[in-house]
Swiss-Prot record:
Catalytic activity as recorded in UniProt: L-methionine + ATP + H2O = S-adenosyl-L-methionine + phosphate + diphosphate
Iron-sulfur found in the keyword field: no
Entry-linked SUPFAM superfamilies: S-adenosylmethionine synthetase
Binding site for ATP: 15, 167-169, 235-238, 246, 252-253, 269, 273, 277
Places the protein is found: Cytoplasm
Gene giving rise to this polypeptide: SAMS1
Protein's name in the database: S-adenosylmethionine synthase 1
EC number: 2.5.1.6
Organism: Catharanthus roseus (Madagascar periwinkle)
Family: Belongs to the AdoMet synthase family.
HAMAP family from the UniProt entry: S_AdoMet_synth1
Length: 393
């Protein structure tokens, strides 16, 4: 059996780039909660003792940006300088302007266009991917790396590993077998965890605790064997972390947000963007399309691409590839996709209920992945029943 290795990485919510994603989406939530028609393009950057929120926002909502920044930092665990940032005493800078009137008239006609007339907020192309290798219809390498990161945060916050600090990264290499275009995981080859820690803990205890409390509960035993390699805090020291260790920016973890290097990516980030931004809404609808194709048994693995021009409602192109795993020809599947999914941005927003913010709806997406999550707020994960005729043998 010929196999190959494929690797995916993740970072947890205390990583500076992810902190920025979460602040940007917390701002989006606050705007949409009060005004579902808010137009939001919110970027965040951070470095030692400083967070800056900037971008273009047109909204009827009253938003306390500084409070959102401090609350988000605090809930992640950035409560003192020694963990990387002090939520209550850091500098918060805000530079928010209105959406450009040129963009506003072209996309939504200053809010006068009907939903089916709303144009894409920009040009671009987005990809959706799905695979039958996990119950989530997501790549195993990505699922495991993401779950390790989430588990790191869980054992920090519940006190299981009190030496943990917010920042951390994970990486998983899986050995795969290619079964006529479908991906079959064989075993976990390598696990890397680098986590921020306090001064008191030894490297031996870090390794022991990570194996017992993080790796064991996350990675199914059947994938681990005596040859699995573990690199646990391989640098030997990771006390300085968060924005103190590295600068952070919104939109710098787009592969972690999506499919862990599988499929493809059009380059557009998600966080801090309202649904007229097709970087986000377009990527969500093609995930639903790809997942529905696989979940309905049309294919074992699938990628869907959609593309847009600014101000134009209809997509310019839709592409489907099932990597040779389709039960019917790809051109038939493409027809089914076009019949069952409305790719116009205004209709995506309605069909996936993307104008509804508040209660941390988009904030939740900003750490541990936008796809493969079992949560009713992740409306794009709902599988649509697709009608199709099995090819006669």
């Amino acid at each position: 059996m010929e196999t190959f290795l494929f690797t995916s990485e993740s970072v947890n919510e205390g990583h500076p780039d992810k902190l920025c994603d979460q602040i940007s989406d917390a701002v989006l939530d606050a705007c949409l909660e009060q005004d579902p028609d808010s137009k939001v393009a919110c970027e965040t950057c951070t470095k030692t003792n400083m967070v800056m929120v900037f971008g273009e926002i047109t909204t009827k909502a009253t938003v306390d940006y500084e409070k959102i920044v401090r609350d988000t930092c605090r809930s992640i665990g950035f409560v003192s300088d020694d963990v990387g940032l002090d939520a209550d005493n850091c500098k918060v800078l805000v530079n928010i302007e209105q959406q450009s009137p040129d963009i506003a008239q072209g996309v939504h006609g200053h809010l006068t266009k009907r939903p089916e007339e709303i144009g894409a907020g920009d040009q671009g192309h987005m990809f959706g991917y799905a695979t039958d290798e996990t119950p989530e219809f997501m790549p195993l390498s990505h699922v495991l790396a993401t779950k390790l990161g989430a588990r790191l945060t869980e054992v920090r916050k519940n006190g299981t590993c009190p030496w943990l600090r917010p920042d951390g990264k994970t990486q998983v290499t899986v050995e795969y077998y290619n079964e006529n275009g479908a991906m079959v995981p064989v075993r976990v080859h390598t696990v890397v965890i680098s986590t921020q820690h306090d001064e008191t803990v030894t490297n031996d205890q870090i390794a022991a605790d990570l194996k017992e409390h993080v790796i064991k509960p996350v990675i199914p035993e059947k994938y681990l064997d005596e040859r699995t390699i573990f690199h646990l805090n391989p640098s030997g020291r990771f006390v300085i972390g968060g924005p103190h260790g590295d600068a952070g920016l919104t939109g710098r973890k787009i592969i972690i947000d999506t499919y862990g290097g599988w499929g493809a990516h059009g380059g557009g980030a998600f966080s801090g963007k309202d649904p007229t931004k097709v970087d986000r809404s377009g990527a969500y609808i093609v995930r639903q399309a790809a997942k529905s194709i696989v979940a309905n048994g049309l294919a074992r693995r699938c990628i869907v691409q959609v593309s847009y021009a600014i101000g134009v409602p209809e997509p310019l192109s839709v592409f489907v590839d099932t990597y040779g795993t389709g039960k019917i020809p790809d051109k038939e599947i493409l027809k089914i996709v076009k019949e069952n999914f409305d790719f116009r941005p205004g209709m995506i927003a309605i069909n996936l209920d993307l104008k509804r913010g508040g209660s941390g709806r988009f904030l939740k997406t900003a750490a541990y992945g936008h796809f493969g999550r079992d949560d009713p707020d992740f409306t794009w994960e709902v599988v649509k029943p697709l009608k199709w005729e099995k090819a006669a043998n």
